[in-house]
Amino acid sequence: MIEILLFVHITIAVLLIIVILMQRSGSDGISSISGGNNMGVVSAKTVGNFLTKSTIILTTLFLINAIVLANLSSKKKSDLVSKINEIEENQAENSLPIAK
């Protein structure tokens, strides 16, 4: 489960980076690579709104996924600690001398 969520987390991070770099800035950034001011079928305002909404959605998914991963990781760590404590207690009980 953690492996799947980690893969999703990395995928969201890459998509988030791409969407942020595609957004228009003062110097047009990487968005100028796609053809500059070619308005074609879709207007620049529509593309800007889509990229803004995509950024918000991806950021929300990224944060939720990060919180879920952190919770699962802490539970897994506490399970491991409790198993180690159990093993140590069993070894301590077995190492005591037997009275005859």
Curated annotation (Swiss-Prot):
GO terms for MF: protein-transporting ATPase activity
The entry's keywords: Cell membrane, Membrane, Protein transport, Translocation, Transmembrane, Transmembrane helix, Transport
Topology with respect to the bilayer: Multi-pass membrane protein
Disulfide bonds listed in the record: none
Keyword Plastid: no
GO biological process: intracellular protein transmembrane transport; protein secretion; protein transport by the Sec complex
Localization: Cell membrane
Recorded family membership: Belongs to the SecG family.
Protein name (database record): Protein-export membrane protein SecG
Gene name, Swiss-Prot/TrEMBL: secG
